[in-house]
């Protein structure tokens, strides 16, 4: 039996979900089993940074914490680090670097064989990374 496809939500998609997604994104979320959804611990860090900048937004804190509780948050590991080193060097050599956090997330998705769900077109520059935009643009 083949392993189920994993979908890693980028920070922008996670933010859209937390803020209340549009109909296309909501439809995709309903169609995909929760066990197939994940975020990188890098995305978790970005979401928590956003909360730290808005300590009085208690409703947002509750929503983000619940979102993170329901999804698999994949820990950054040595496999992701090895992929990051090679990916960053390749992107820089090609003259097409990504931002540091985006490179970390792309490397993490590649290291676990996940499809990256994002609307950031810059990820198309990453060789071998499968990207899907679930309609939140």
Predicted regions mapped to residue ranges:
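Alpha-helix capping/helix-boundary segments
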Residues: 13-14, 43, 80, 105, ...
């Amino acid at each position: 039996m083949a392993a189920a496809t994993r979908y890693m939500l980028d920070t922008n998609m996670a933010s859209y979900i937390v803020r209340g997604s549009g109909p296309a994104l909501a439809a995709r979320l309903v169609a995909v089993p929760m066990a197939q959804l994940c975020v990188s611990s890098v995305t978790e860090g970005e979401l928590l940074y956003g909360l730290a900048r808005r300590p009085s937004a208690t409703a947002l804190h509750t929503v983000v914490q619940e979102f993170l509780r329901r999804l698999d948050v994949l820990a950054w590991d040595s496999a992701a680090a090895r992929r990051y080193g090679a990916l960053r060097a390749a992107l820089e050599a090609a003259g097409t670097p990504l931002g540091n956090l985006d490179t970390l997330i792309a490397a993490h998705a590649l290291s676990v064989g996940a499809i990256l769900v994002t609307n950031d077109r810059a990820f198309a520059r990453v060789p071998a990374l499968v990207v899907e935009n679930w309609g939140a643009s």
